[in-house]
Amino acid sequence: RPPGFTPFR
């Protein structure tokens, strides 16, 4: 995952 990856956003 890349930094700042947010699947909950």
UniProtKB/Swiss-Prot annotation:
UniProt family annotation: Belongs to the bradykinin-related peptide family.
Function summary: Thr6-bradykinin: Induces relaxation of rat smooth muscle from tail artery and contraction of that from ileum, urinary bladder and uterus. Binds to both bradykinin receptor B1 (BDKRB1) and B2 (BDKRB2).
MF-aspect GO terms: toxin activity
Location, primary (coarse class): secreted
UniProt keywords, alphabetically: Amphibian defense peptide, Bradykinin receptor impairing toxin, G-protein coupled receptor impairing toxin, Hydroxylation, Secreted, Toxin
Tissue specificity note: Expressed by the skin glands.
Localization per record: Secreted
Modified residues (4-hydroxyproline): 3
Record's protein name: [Thr6]-bradykinin
Organism for this UniProt entry: Physalaemus nattereri
GO biological process terms on file: defense response
GO CC, alphabetical: extracellular region
